[in-house]
């Protein structure tokens, strides 16, 4: 009997991680994406405005998300990572580290997908003809 393992069905949710350079949102929904379970941001976890987008704030938010998911009965997550996109940056900000915290906190990870909006033909980017001068 000790060699037998029971299969435990994983209850999946979807974690939408929006990592911009100003803040990080971790938004958990059901599989269809219609029903929101919970939303947490980096700004809810730290006091200083400059720390909202930091990896530390994102990891605190993700740990809290994992704990609340377990209370709701969600044991596994598919993850959608999103950057600002459009005619702005297509690389996720430092808050994408929240993914690592979700994995460490005991949540099973299903699929990881990049859902950054990428334009097929975009409007002109701000900054002028000669670009932003520092």
From Swiss-Prot:
GO terms for molecular function: structural constituent of ribosome. Pfam families: Ribosomal_S11. HAMAP family: Ribosomal_uS11 (MF_01310). GO terms for cellular component: ribonucleoprotein complex; ribosome. Keywords: Ribonucleoprotein, Ribosomal protein. Belongs to the universal ribosomal protein uS11 family. PROSITE patterns: RIBOSOMAL_S11. GO terms for biological process: translation. Residues 115-134 are annotated as: Disordered. This is Small ribosomal subunit protein uS11. Residues 125-134 have a biased composition (Basic residues). InterPro entries: Ribosomal_uS11, Ribosomal_uS11_CS, Ribosomal_uS11_sf. It comes from Syntrichia ruralis.
